[in-house]
Every structure is written in C-alpha cells, then in structure tokens.
Amino acid sequence: VAGIYQRLRQELIVGGGEPSESPDPSTKSTAIVSGLVILGLLVWLGFENAWTLLFVVGLLLSVFLHEIGHFATARWTGMKVTQFYMGFGPRLWSRSRGELEYGVRALPLGAFVRIVGMNVLDEVEPGDEARAYRNKSYPRQFLVITAGSLMHFILALAIFTGVYSSAGRWAETGRVEVAFTSAPGSPAEALGLQVGDFVTAIGADRVSSRDELVEAITSRAPGDRVDVSFERDGVSTTKSVVLAANPREPDVAYLGIASWSKDYVRESPLSSLGWAVRDSVSSVGNSVKGVVTALNPMNSIRALQNPNENPETRPTTVVGASQIGGQLGESEGLKGVLLLLASVNVFVGVFNLFPLLPFDGGHAAIATYERLRSRNGTRYRADVNKMIPVTTVVLGLLAFLLFAGLYLDITNPL
C-alpha cells in the first residue's frame, strides 16, 4: 500500500514520469511482451476494420499533439523538461538527448511530459530552481498546463475546416428531394412523384427544406386540393392533387412521401473556417454537459443494470468510440471518421480541464489558487499533499467508469 501511495504521489501529483535508471530484466521482458501484444492487436484491428484502425491512429496522434503542446510551451517559457513518453508502464524504447529522455512505453493509454518542479512536493536540484514550473509566473504556468487542451481544440478546428472545404458540411442544400413514396393510392402516387424528384412548392408556398415542406402540408386539411410543383431531370412540373388524411393522425394532411433536404455541402475555405469555429464552440457546450454526465457514477450504474435504457448517458471508452468510428467509416467514409475524431478532441480537451487532480485542470486550479493567495510579492505555495485523498477518490471514480465502459462496450456495443 505504501508503494502504491508513493507512486501515486510521484507520478500523478508531481507530474508523471518514472526513474530514468535502466529497468531490471523482468521489467524489460514484460515491456517487450506487452508491446508485441499491442502490436498484434493493431495488426488484427487493421484486418478487421481499417476505418477503426484509422480512428485509433488518429487518437494516438491527438495524444501525441497534446503532449507536444505541453512540451513546446514549457521549453518556450524556460522550464526544464526531463521526459517525453508515449504510453505508460514498462519502457519499450528510449533515448536521451541532452537533458531530455524520450521514448515509448508498453501501454498506449496516453502520454506524459515530465516538467521539473510542478509543485512543492517535487524535489528539484538547486541548479534547476530557476527553471522549475513552480517558480515561473502565473501566466506561464497557466499557458503550459492548458496547452494540451488547447492543442485538442486547434486540432478539432483544423479537422472541421479541412473536411468542410473538401468533403463538405452536413447542411441544408436548399432543395427538397423525394426519398421514397408511400403505399399505392396516396396523393404522391396520383402526382406521379418518383424517388429523386425535387418538390419546389406546395400551392403558393415555396419550399427549400424538409421542414418547410412538412409545414406547407400540415398547415392544410385533409381533402384540400393543392398545386404541387416538382422538378425531374431539370424539367419543372405542376399538378393538382387532393391531400389525404395521415393514416396515424386522421386530422393531419398527408402527401405520402419521405423527403430530405440535407447533404454534405462544400464550403469555401473562409466559410469552412467560420463554420468550424461555430461548430467547435457548440461542441464545447455539448462536451461540458457530456463531462458532467460522464462523471456521474449513477449513470454508469443504471447503464450496467439496463444497457439499452439510455445509450446517451452510459460511459463509453476508446473501444466504444473506435467501434463508432469504424461504423461511420463504412457508411460515411473518411469524412465521417474525421468528424468524429474532431468531436472527440473537443470532448477530451474539455474533460482534461476538469479542475481536480490528476487532470491538467487540477494543476491550473492550483496555479490560480496560489496566484490569488499571493500578496505583496510573497508567493503562496499550496499544500498539494492535502489533495492526494481527493485525487485518490477521483482516480477511483475514473477506474470505475473505465471498467464499466469497457464492459458495456464489449458486451453491449453501441
């Protein structure tokens, strides 16, 4: 227990990382076996569903860029960075360059950058005090600790912009297309409407969206005669027909078609950027609600009892997200995978700013608290030891959510 406590204290409160000395042979063997297992799983995943593999690679790249954000801003602000690793657990491969040790660890569950002097618990060599995180100004601390989430937001913005300007944005096209017609005897059959026709007007009401078409029809009564204008192969036609009663709602008028008016619409680069900003901001709002939902353990408990009751509130892990990515790839292609990846980046960026350790938001909250408590040139130092019990509870909650999510993703995929 004492060993676990010390590891928690060192790696999660002080800032991650492990001793740099060479691992013993058993640890090295474990690392090699773990790495081979992970490599085998990735190869299998590539054969099983290439889109899922692409999504997983995108997630790993996102994690790498997250740490690049911390690393680059720490170096830029004069902090000392001693480690940069992809993955956790036993080391698979590492190199040293100057004061920096970098490499890959066996478990691809994230990454970390080790910055000296994250708080008063971190022992710092006397010669490194000037370069310690804790001795830098508050703006520099805040920049470094939030740079990871900032990278997620920038990546999401870039993906949204790229997809909108190349493949298009899911939006109103300005045309209402007939998707299919109903059973024989409907007004649509009397008009001769076919799949692929475009409805342009109901009476005097011009329609350019599905909602406008529904409004134009339901604002009339069954038995009303109306002129319906539609276009086929570039030729416009207008015919008169009597609206029927909706089989499910006899008081509502009924034409007898299903329609859609949305599709992927390519935008100019400038317009794409504008829409990317709007959609990123909207995703931030949705992600805040999602974080609150995800961190509520009652949602996980209810999901374990009844997985299909409310899929929107059940915990989802990388496994579930990757499954969704594979499904989107098969139905929507590359754009579907990329748009999901952008949304996930926004969520991770928001989630990581949760103001408790071990999240980056916890370090940002501590830096802000210290800044507010500092007076007359005297720097206040928060006692991070007091946060360890809270951090332990948070880690316990995260572990529960992780295992609950994994169980649901494997036994009852979305």
Predicted feature locations:
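Aromatic-capped interface at the extracytoplasmic side
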Residues: 46-56, 159-175, 410-413
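Internal alpha-helical transmembrane segments
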Residues: 76, 109-177, 389-393
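PDZ-domain C-terminal substructure recognizer with occasional recognition of PDZ-binding tails
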Residues: 194, 200-201, 214-258
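Functional transmembrane alpha-helices
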Residues: 5-30, 131-132, 136, 246-348, ...
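Hydrophobic core of alpha-helical transmembrane segments in multi-pass integral membrane proteins
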Residues: 28-45, 402
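Small-residue-rich helix-interface/hinge motifs
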Residues: 2-18, 50-127, 351-375
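Final/C-terminal transmembrane alpha-helix of multipass membrane proteins
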Residues: 40, 387-409
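Conserved PDZ fold ligand-binding element
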Residues: 179, 188-211, 280
